[in-house]
Amino acid sequence: MAHHKLERFAENLTFANLFQISFEQLEREGFEYRGRWSEWFGNEAPITLELGCGKGDYCIALARMHPDRNYIGFDIKGARLWRGAKTATEEAMRNVAFVRTRIEMIDRFFAEREVSEIWITF
């Protein structure tokens, strides 16, 4: 199991839809898409956050059902986020992204009024 986890951590670094930034780097440099998520998504669609998204199943399902919205899943566990990031990459989904960080850090990822909804589904 640990071997798979290390492989997933390594693969996480290759996903364009999975953002992993150290707390120190976030404090020092900020997040490159803060206030500019529309540039990453390539549209001005509303953004919904899912906090504690785990494997990203809910974000992926909603992104499939609502291609006119953008979804961002947050979780601290990289091995879990791997599943969602991999699925979204395999399906070439452009309306879903994932961020690996602690929940209390989310304000550093968004400008005021950049997020339409925040969901906690557990």
Predicted segments, located by residue:
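Conserved beta-strand/loop positions that form the S-adenosyl-L-methionine
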Residues: 51, 74
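Conserved short alpha-helix immediately C-terminal to the canonical SAM/SAH-binding motif I
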Residues: 80
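Conserved SAM/SAH-binding beta-strand->alpha-helix loop
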Residues: 77
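Conserved glycine-rich SAM-binding loop
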Residues: 54
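Conserved SAM-binding loop
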Residues: 84
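Short beta-strand element of Class I
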Residues: 69-72
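S-adenosyl-L-methionine
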Residues: 1-49, 57-64, 87-113
